[in-house]
Each structure stands twice: as C-alpha cells, then as structure tokens.
Amino acid sequence: QLAAKITPQTAAILYIKSHHTVQKSMLTVAEAAKVAHAHQLPLIVDAAAEEDLTAYYQADGDIVIYSGAKAIEGPTSGLVVGKKQYVEWVKRQSQGIGRAMKVGKEGILGLTLAIEQYLTATKETGAEMVSRMDKFLKDLNTIAGISARIVWDAAGRDIARAEISFDEKAIGKTTYQIMDELKQGNTAIY
C-alpha cells in the first residue's frame, strides 16, 4: 500500500513512530525503509517522544528526529540522528524557515547534558516497576470502591502502569469529584 502512494513528486517517506498510538498491522521502520529505498527515497522517522536513540537508525531509517524535551527530559530542543547527507541538508536550515525556533547555546548545552544523563541512567524494567507499585496497589485495593491493577504498555514497551478505577456508587462521589479532591491535597495529585 505504501509503494502504491509513491509518485514522481514524492521526496521522502515520513514514518511516525509514537507510543501514544498502538501501531498494529503497520509496517515496521525496517519494512518502511525497504519500500523507501527500493524507490530511491529517504525514510524520515519522527520518533519525537520515543526512548530508544539507536533502534530506528539501526532499522535503516535515514534520518531520525527526536524531541529533546520528551523522553530525553532536556530543554525545548530536538535531536537529529542519521546519514551524513541528510543531516547536512537539515543543517542548511540555519537561516530562513524555522529560524525563530532555533535552539540557543544554553539549550544545546542543556540537551547535551540531558543526553549524557539519559544514556548513562539505569533504566527501570517493567518487572521493577511492578515490584515498586505492588504494595501501593494492594493498599488501594483494600479501600471500598477502589480497584487498582497493573496494566502493560499497549505499544509493547516494557512499561507497567497502575490503572485505578472508582465505583462511584460505592464511594458516593463521582470520579471528577475525587480527582478534584486529590488536586486539593497537601500533595496535589493530578
């Protein structure tokens, strides 16, 4: 289907990799790269909020774009990883379009530090997340009208989260009332 959409005016294939949407029955980055390269087109991977700084380039993405402020937890900035030719083309955009949004030296330094910390930090596994949340969830489940359980990341990443449900009738309050009360506590919970 992707190949059928390529025309003589096609300059590149853009692949958006996002954990915010479950990507089932989609081409992988490697499969999209094969299609792009079969048509002598570069594959641009928008991995703005993704965590792995090497996987998409290793999967044959020609240029991979990350947000410096999302998973990397740096300042408002971005990171471009890719083949030299394409990175050079990105660097040509130092004037003109987008100039007002270019990152200053402080942002570059902040991003550099964030990347260093990101690459050297110990990553918590899903099993470790479950272990850390276990007592909390058990305690929540002792409260009438509250049901708490572990849910795994729908996009397939090794991330465990707590899902907490409220039985409004048993508690006598709506979920929105409970949310508002949690925001008003000594430690605000959103």
Task: Give the role of each language-model region.
Residues 1-123, 137-144, 149, 176:
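Conserved PLP-enzyme active-site core in the AAT-like
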Residues 126-128:
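Active-site capping/gating regions of soluble enzymes
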